[in-house]
Amino acid sequence: MDITRREFAAALTGVAGAATLRRDALRFPAADPCHLPAPIQALTPKTGGIAPITDEERRARIAKAQGLMAAGGIGAIVIEPGSTMHYYSAVDWHPSERTFAMVIPATGAPVWVCPAFEEARARELIRIGDDIRVWQEDESPFARIAGILKDQGAASAKVGLEEEVRFFVMDGLRQAAPSADLVSATPVTAGCRMIKSAAELALMQRATDITILAFKAAFATLRAGMNQYEFGNNMTAALTRLGGSAPWALVGFGKYSAFPHGSVQPQRLERGDIVLLDSGCAVEGY
């Protein structure tokens, strides 16, 4: 039987729509607070009185990193967007194909490398270090990093790469700064991050306290017949109402509780089932 392009496209649309309905039918509309169970609706924020990490503490972290760099003979470290960049600067930036980087030299303030069309946004976010070197679409960001190394007298020194630096960035820098000895920055970054300050511990404790309260509220919503998405959404809604950010939850019922990271199979809670709930949140990034 012959079929036209229009008929073929319509058939594909129908299949996709059926798949979407099957998947979405298992999801609970947690975004609508009117549908949240009473134990979740009763929750209120528990983030009052928290003290965010100050710029002074971040500068102290940079100073400590520079001390570790001196001890290890490292002339600079290069950091891409991620938790380490946030740790030293509070800058959150989505990593993309356009290189955005923080360079911490052995002495002095950090220097930044940024796509030219993102400069205005970068200046809104960057509070530590005002030297931002931009690159146009027809220019190399790695040449900008190499220029920073040259200005810092580190063109032929050990240059540490933070563990989240991607291969194409490392490879581009290797070509732009062939005399640099590219090494791991982990002795520096882990040397700072693995020892938590009192302020960090307080934020981690608050995130833990919020998570425990959310567990109690979410478990109070368990009922026979609910699916894993409904329970997971109750948990993330509880974390959000308590003031947690970046909430997440992995859920498994019955035999699927043996899957440490959950299963995509539809699940309905039955009396006597084991319930797996792996969940958490952050407070001020911790």
What are these regions (language model features)?
Residues 128-141, 168-170, 212-218, 235-246, ...:
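A short, terminal or domain-edge coil/loop segment
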Residues 80, 184-186, 215-219, 247-252:
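Short beta-strands and strand-loop turn motifs
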Residues 85-96, 186-191, 195-198, 226-286:
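Short catalytic-site patches enriched in acidic/histidine residues
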Residues 2-210:
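A composition/biophysics-driven feature that prefers long, compositionally simple stretches
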Residues 74, 150, 178, 206-216, ...:
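Generic secondary-structure signature for well-ordered alpha-helical cores
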